Regions:
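Internal acidic/polar
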Residues: 72-95, 99, 125-126
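Helix-turn-helix DNA-binding module
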Residues: 107, 111-112, 122-139, 153
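Structural recognition of an alpha-helix C-terminal capping motif at a helix-to-coil junction
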Residues: 32-39, 48-59
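DNA-recognition helix of helix-turn-helix
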Residues: 58, 133-157
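Short, Lys/Arg-enriched C-terminal cap helix and immediately downstream tail that follows
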Residues: 20, 148-167
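A short pre-motif secondary-structure segment
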Residues: 116-117
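A short, charge-rich alpha-helical start-of-domain segment used by transcription regulators
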Residues: 1-18, 22, 28-31, 47
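Arg/Lys-rich amphipathic alpha helix in sigma70-family domain 2
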Residues: 55-77, 95
């Protein structure tokens, strides 16, 4: 690996965990996936470690989501809704509500728009985003602009109780 792994870890780990959290919606699982991606980087010694880590981590999260979907189809016990826990503070409820609206708004985006937005939010450059998504570098700015606009529209619609079409 051309760059020092400790330095890459120091500068990339938190962004990678945030990126993964927005894919798996579980903080502990996001950290586990980030650590696994770094472990794989030690073995593979990629030329561009930062971009490689995000690509590998995204693939691991995608594989895990597919595996989980298969398990849910086969295990009827998982169809039960988990019970909500009561929170004592109105601020905590508001924050949770905002997180749920952001998550719902993200899910209304097309997979491509969501991926580009999350990669950008994680700190990847336009070149790194283009390499991972297969989009032309020049299309990244347009895609980001559209994704941001649609995210805001979906978030605001969620706040007012409206429905926004997916994609």
């Amino acid at each position: 690996m051309p760059q020092d792994l400790a330095e890459i870890y120091r500068t990339t780990y938190r962004a990678l965990v945030r990126f993964l959290y927005r894919k798996v919606w579980d903080a502990e699982r996001a950290e586990d996936l980030a650590q696994e991606a770094f472990a794989r980087a030690v073995v593979h010694k990629p030329e561009n470690p930062r971009g490689w880590l995000f690509i590998v981590a995204a693939n691991m999260a995608r594989d895990e989501a597919r595996r989980a979907a298969r398990e849910r189809r086969h295990l009827s016990l998982l169809t039960a809704e988990p019970q909500e826990t009561a929170r004592g503070h109105e601020e905590a409820l508001d924050a949770e509500s905002d997180r749920a609206r952001v998550r719902a708004a993200l899910e209304t985006l097309s997979p491509r728009d969501r991926e580009v937005l999350l990669l950008w939010d994680a700190g990847l450059s336009y070149e790194e985003i283009a390499a991972q998504t297969g989009l032309a570098r020049g299309a990244i700015g347009t895609t980001l602009s559209r994704a941001r606009r649609r995210l805001v529209e979906a978030f605001e619609a969620g706040r007012s109780g409206e429905h926004v079409a997916r994609g």
